[in-house]
Amino acid sequence: MKTVQRFCQIIYIFAVCNRSRIYRMGKDNYLHCYKMVWDTEFAPNPHHGVLTLATCKPRIRKYANVGDWISGWTSVKVHDKNNRIIEFRNGERLIYIAKISKIIPFDQYWHEYPQKRPHELINGKSLTRKGCRCCREEGKNISIHYDCGDNIYKPVRNNSGKFVQLPNGGGHNENDKDHDLSGKNVLICNEFYYFGVHHACKIDKQLFSYPIPRWKKIKLEDVAKIINYIQSNYKSGIVVENEDYTK
């Protein structure tokens, strides 16, 4: 009898201590959907083994939760990173879908993900590659631009909450700064499926039949089919590697 009572006490204590955790596990999660007009590998950035959304879409970045999924779909016309226009006249296709594994503020992102900072390119090549620095020192004709790194907001020392915007390959300037920072957070996705605009995935309507406006969120339980399909048929990461992708 004492053994049974002791067992019941242990179960009760465990339930009380873990009540908040159990509640969080039961919290509703969503799939956030939006249309993309640009796909330049900047927002989102699928490189270095993790997909990040650090700029654009401030409402999603501000209100999404860990465990939510985000997805970008084609508009009728989508610009790639070389400003080529790809047209989609027969409905939306999936450019990427990703599960949010971590949400962090900009200052933490700056320090923890230095590989995501924009890197200077000379004549299309990284400054760290052999020959590029020589071109600059010898005064040869060069063109300088930046890769698609999205970690572009550097915290200002001793001035909490202020950031300096770095030169970047995403086309973002000071006019975009307030819009980007209003999202408060950077979304980190360890599990992601990035098809890219050139290989955007056609999704059967039996798997996903929702119209995609500028932004829409749907309960995960209502879109389980498309997530299960993607997970079963593709490996997490950049799904199609080709010469268009800048690592």
Model-derived features with residue positions:
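Structural motif
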Residues: 67-69
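Short beta-strand-centered aromatic/proline hotspots
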Residues: 82-84, 93-102
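Compositionally biased, charged N-terminal/linker segments
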Residues: 2-65, 75-78, 245-247
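A general structural signal for short secondary-structure junctions and capping/turn motifs
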Residues: 22-26, 60-63, 86-90, 178, ...
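Eukaryotic short linear interaction motifs
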Residues: 79, 103-108
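Short acidic alpha-helical/loop segments enriched in Asp/Glu that coordinate divalent cations
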Residues: 86-94, 108-114
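Contiguous surface segments at macromolecular interaction interfaces
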Residues: 15-23, 107-247
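Short, charged beta-turn/beta-strand-edge "cap" motif at the junction between a beta-strand
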Residues: 73-87
